[in-house]
Design a protein with these regions (language model features):
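Long, contiguous hydrophobic alpha-helical segments, chiefly transmembrane helices and signal peptides
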Residues: 79, 101-109, 129-131, 169
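Stable alpha-helical elements in mature extracytoplasmic
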Residues: 78-85, 89, 139-146
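Catalytic cores and adjacent binding grooves of peptidoglycan-active enzymes
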Residues: 7-11, 119-202
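Envelope-exposed proteins and targeting segments
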Residues: 63-67, 71, 97-99, 125-129, ...
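A mature extracytoplasmic/lumenal domain signature
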Residues: 65, 105-108, 133-135, 173
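Extracytoplasmic cell-surface/polysaccharide-interacting catalytic and binding patches
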Residues: 4-85, 162-164, 176-199
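Extended, low-complexity, intrinsically disordered C-terminal regulatory tails
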Residues: 84-116
């Protein structure tokens, strides 16, 4: 008989964050280097952001049946690629979680960055969005797995932030390229439903 170590109640309750979502200096630099290598401007002031909006470099996030924005979103604009990510990810989130995705932040000029923001934050470019992190449970499990999979595919760089709690997503799709996401809902559901390889001998 194959012995399996018992799992404590504390271990069962403690949510597990995939390694891909752990924040690090390397992760920050990857996002920053992407922005620099694609010559993305870092907007300094709200006026600079308004100019980018007027020129069509940033597009509005308006919300729909699959995603919503909190009132705290000061500038509900992002690059076309970041918006395409939200539009593609939100329906899968709704299917998996039964509730709309919530965007808590998007493009943000450097002069409006919070005091604890990293100097190399890419929010001033518009390629990043912050999402509300679901409470512990099946939805959070799905979100973590989905973001880790998309990061492994090189489409995004994601971090599960703690102060304040949220999910930071930078969309690493070159400007002018369409964002196409795999069907993560069905894939992760199939993985979760697969029988465990650890069986007691009969």
């Amino acid at each position: 008989m194959l012995a399996v170590a018992p799992v404590s109640n504390a271990q069962r309750r403690r949510p597990q964050t995939p390694p891909e979502l752990h924040g690090s200096k390397a992760s920050v630099e990857k996002m920053y280097d992407f922005a620099l290598s694609h010559h993305l401007p870092f907007y300094l002031t709200p006026a600079n952001l308004d100019d980018a909006i007027a020129k069509g470099r940033l597009v509005p996030l308006t919300g729909d049946a699959t995603y919503e924005l909190t009132r705290g979103v000061g500038f509900s604009y992002a690059t076309r690629e970041a918006k395409q990510f939200v539009l593609a990810f939100a329906p899968q989130y709704l299917t998996a979680c039964g509730t709309p995705l919530t965007v808590t932040s998007a493009a943000r000029p450097m002069s409006r960055q919070p005091h604890n923001a990293n100097p190399h934050s890419v929010h001033p470019t518009g390629i990043a969005v912050d999402l509300r992190r679901p409470s512990a449970g099946p939805c959070l499990d799905w979100v973590r797995g989905a973001l880790a999979e998309l990061e492994d595919k090189g489409l995004i760089e994601a971090t599960e932030e703690r102060h304040p709690v949220h999910l930071h997503i930078a969309v690493l799709v070159p400007p002018g390229t369409s964002v196409v996401l795999p069907q993560i809902v069905n894939h992760l559901a199939a993985v979760k439903a697969a029988p465990s390889v650890l069986h007691s001998a009969r």
